[in-house]
Amino acid sequence: MVIKLSFHVCSHILNYFCSYISGYKNRFQNFIKHLREMGDEVIVVTNHEGVPQEFHGAKVIGSWSFPCPLYGKVPLSLALSPRIISEVAKFKPDIIHASSPGIMVFGALAIAKLLSVPLVMSYHTHVPVYIPRYTFSWLVEPMWQVIRFLHRAADLTLVPSVAIIKDFETAHVISANRIRLWNKGVDSASFHPRFRSHEMRVRLSDSEPDKPLIIHVGRFGREKNLDFLKMVMDRLPGVRIAFVGDGPYRTELEKMFEGMPAVFTGMMQGEELSQAYASGDVFVMPSESETLGQVVLESMSSGVPVVAVRAGGIPDIIPGDAEGRTSFLFAPGDLDDCVGKIRLLLTDDEFRGDMGRTARAEMEKRDWRAASKTIRNEFYSSAIDYWRKKQADIVQPLQWLAQMFMPAPNRVIGGGIKQ
């Protein structure tokens, strides 16, 4: 194992500071904050939109970007200009950490190879699942080929859930010894039951705070299966729902819920977001393709029970032994089970309160700092070890060939006899 008092880490992260809503953006921001607190030097390469000069003491380098053709609010950038290569070279990183998949990861790969630096890739968006919903199903296998190419070129891959590890094994992406699970963390101080607010509940309920209130927080995309919530609400008369967030599917969603007891607040941040979480009764997560499920963690940390699909990375947050104690899961597409569990929580205040407190206690164990320490002290060191072994595997055959075909220099031994 390689032990260092201080790493020089270069992070290539798309959509790091822009208005695009995502759990992985929040995850990286918390991760870099903790790296800086542990004394590591960090530079961040990201798209140019809304980029500050620094973040918690980490220098931020913006790269020219352009809108994604299929998802206009997502900026894309290769981050491979001479300026960026020069900045990274001057920084002399011990490791490059890139988010995958995306265009920027190709730039990170090129720079890592050019500068001969170990490369860690963390996989955050399960694109093969989304492709059929946005384009054509026949593109799924080519996407897997791209993923194989990228992650086989990396020294270590981090994934957000056990489900993704299984998918990678099934698709023969990389060997199991080069995959690690990036444990989920939550800011339990910022997402706390103490932020429950009557004023916020009035706002979320359209001035009907005494009505049962379902809350959903996140990015509104077609792939999030938000249509399912319409069917849920059709089965729950007298119940209100609040949507907190934004995204390309918002306009269609507002039309879908027109005339229904629904409120769309738009994006919230900071204490306002903390109040929104804590002021609901039940959080419902219908998405079947969540790799991370950060909003589920934040709701449970706020003391609000969750009813979520048993899919993707959610069972890592609510495992079998915790189901029914910290929150509920339902099978994909099982409307009856979902509605039944929501109804139970909304009609039994004591049970809902107990579950919320148990969820909160569980989330207090999921500390961002502990997860960040594991990556820094264990995963980065494993990547560096693997990279060094790979370098040695390349150099040793070359040395052997040199010894075979190049004559050794004459050496003088003993009393001057040449050998």
Regions found by a protein language model. Give the residues of each.
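Short hydrophobic beta-strand element within catalytic cores of glycosyltransferases
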Residues: 305-308, 318
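Carbohydrate-associated surface elements
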Residues: 163, 185
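Short alpha-helical donor nucleotide-sugar binding micro-motif in glycosyltransferases
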Residues: 88, 267-268, 275-280
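Conserved acidic donor-binding segment of nucleotide-sugar-dependent glycosyltransferases
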Residues: 320-335, 344-349
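Aromatic "clamp/platform" in nucleotide-sugar-dependent glycosyltransferases that forms part
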Residues: 269, 288
